[in-house]
C-alpha cells in the first residue's frame, strides 16, 4: 500500500523525512525512465485541474508535461478564468472540482486559499506556489543536490541561501532542511530573515537530523566552506516600486558574484537559482530594472556566475518536471509498481 495515496502537498512538513526522501527516490526513477524512453503511463484516465491565479512558465509546463507523460489529462484555469473567491466561494469551487477531477494544482497569492481547497475538495491538492511556501521547487532542489553528491548524506552538505529569505523560498528551505538534515545558512539582512515561528520550529526539528540551520547577516560566515550557494530574485512583478526600492537597497551587497564564490574557499562550489534570474539585459523588462537601480552586470547574480553554473541551474529547472511527476504518481495511485 502506498502511504502517500490521496495525500496533499501544501508544504513540505506535510511529509515525514522518510516520505520526502521516498518522493525524491521515485523522481530519480521516473527521470531515468523518461531519459531511456521507457516511460510507463501510470495515470491513464486521470484528470487534473491546474488553477493559476499567478502566471508561470516552469510550474505550468512541469505539471502539464508530467501529466501528459503519465497519460493524464489536464485543464488549465488561468488568471481570471474561474470565479474562485469572487462570484463563487472557494469552498464551492473546491467541491465541484473535487467531483470532476482526480487532483488539483493551485498557484496563487494566498496560502489560506489552498488550505480551503484541500479541506473541501476531497482529492489531492498540490501547491505550485503561494506567498508562504513553494514545496515543489524544494523537491527539485533536493533532487539536484542528491544528483551532484549521490554518495553524501544531506547533513554532510552545506548550502547557503543568499538574498531575501523572508518569503516562500526561505520558509520552504527551512522545512526541507529540518526534514532531511541539510546544513543550511540563510544569509541576509535581518529585515529579510524568515518568519520567527517557522525558523524556531525547524531549528528545533533539525536537532534530530545531524544538520544545522542559522540566519546570519555576515556573508563571510554564511558562505564559508559551503558546497552550494543558492539565490533567487529580489523583486517580484506586482509588488510596489517602494517595496522594490527598499529591498534592493537592503540586498545590494548580497549579490552572488565571483568575489562571493572566492569567499567560500571552495573552488568546486556550485550555484543554484530557481529562476527566472535577473542576470543579463536581454529583455526590455530586466534591462529597465537593472538600469533604474544602477546594476550593470545582473542583480541578484552576475551574468558571469550564472553562465558558469547554467548547466546545474537548468538541470535544477528540469527537475521540477520529475519531482512533480513523482508527487502526481505517489498521490494518485494506491500502489506503485515498476
UniProtKB/Swiss-Prot annotation:
It catalyses: carbamoyl phosphate + L-ornithine = L-citrulline + phosphate + H(+). Its main location: cytoplasm. This is Ornithine carbamoyltransferase. One of its GO terms (cellular component) is cytoplasm. PROSITE patterns: CARBAMOYLTRANSFERASE. Pfam families: OTCace, OTCace_N. One of its GO terms (molecular function) is ornithine carbamoyltransferase activity. The keyword Amino-acid biosynthesis does not apply. Its EC number is 2.1.3.3. The gene is arcB. L-ornithine binds at residues 168, 232, 236-237. It comes from the Bacteria. Pathway: Amino-acid degradation; L-arginine degradation via ADI pathway; carbamoyl phosphate from L-arginine: step 2/2. It comes from Buchnera aphidicola subsp. Acyrthosiphon pisum (strain 5A). Reversibly catalyzes the transfer of the carbamoyl group from carbamoyl phosphate (CP) to the N(epsilon) atom of ornithine (ORN) to produce L-citrulline. It is found in: Cytoplasm. Carbamoyl phosphate binds at residues 56-59, 107, 134-137, 274-275, 320.
Amino acid at each position: 500500500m502506498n502511504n502517500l495515496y490521496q495525500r496533499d502537498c501544501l508544504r513540505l512538513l506535510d511529509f515525514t523525512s522518510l516520505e520526502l526522501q521516498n518522493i525524491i527516490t521515485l523522481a530519480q526513477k521516473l527521470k531515468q525512465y523518461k531519459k531511456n524512453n521507457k516511460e510507463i503511463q501510470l495515470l491513464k484516465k486521470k484528470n487534473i485541474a491546474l488553477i493559476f491565479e499567478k502566471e508561470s512558465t516552469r510550474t505550468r509546463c512541469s505539471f502539464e508535461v508530467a501529466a501528459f507523460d503519465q497519460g493524464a489529462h489536464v485543464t488549465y484555469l488561468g488568471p481570471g478564468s474561474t470565479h474562485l473567491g469572487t462570484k463563487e466561494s472557494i469552498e464551492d469551487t473546491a467541491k465541484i472540482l473535487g467531483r470532476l477531477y482526480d487532483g488539483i494544482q493551485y498557484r496563487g497569492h494566498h496560502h489560506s486559499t489552498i488550505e480551503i481547497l484541500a479541506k473541501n475538495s476531497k482529492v489531492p491538492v498540490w501547491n505550485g506556489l503561494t506567498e508562504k511556501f513553494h514545496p515543489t521547487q524544494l523537491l527539485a532542489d533536493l533532487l539536484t543536490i542528491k544528483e551532484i553528491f549521490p554518495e553524501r548524506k544531506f547533513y554532510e552538505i552545506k548550502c547557503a541561501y543568499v538574498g531575501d529569505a523572508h518569503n516562500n523560498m526561505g520558509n520552504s528551505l527551512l522545512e526541507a532542511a529540518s526534514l532531511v538534515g541539510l546544513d543550511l545558512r540563510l544569509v541576509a539582512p535581518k529585515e529579510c530573515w524568515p518568519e520567527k515561528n517557522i525558523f524556531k520550529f525547524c531549528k528545533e526539528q533539525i536537532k534530530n537530523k545531524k544538520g544545522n540551520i542559522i540566519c546570519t547577516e555576515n556573508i563571510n560566515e554564511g558562505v564559508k566552506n559551503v558546497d552550494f550557494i543558492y539565490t533567487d530574485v529580489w523583486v517580484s512583478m506586482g509588488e510596489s516600486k517602494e517595496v522594490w526600492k527598499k529591498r534592493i537597497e537592503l540586498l545590494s551587497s548580497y549579490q552572488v558574484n565571483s568575489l562571493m564564490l572566492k569567499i567560500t574557499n571552495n573552488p568546486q562550489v556550485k550555484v543554484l537559482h530557481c529562476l527566472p534570474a535577473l542576470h543579463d539585459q536581454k529583455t526590455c523588462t530586466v534591462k529597465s530594472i537593472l538600469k533604474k537601480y544602477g546594476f550593470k552586470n545582473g542583480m541578484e547574480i552576475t551574468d558571469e556566475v550564472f553562465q558558469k553554473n547554467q548547466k546545474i541551474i537548468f538541470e535544477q529547472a528540469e527537475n521540477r518536471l520529475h519531482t512533480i511527476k513523482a508527487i502526481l504518481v505517489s498521490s494518485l495511485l494506491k500502489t506503485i509498481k515498476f
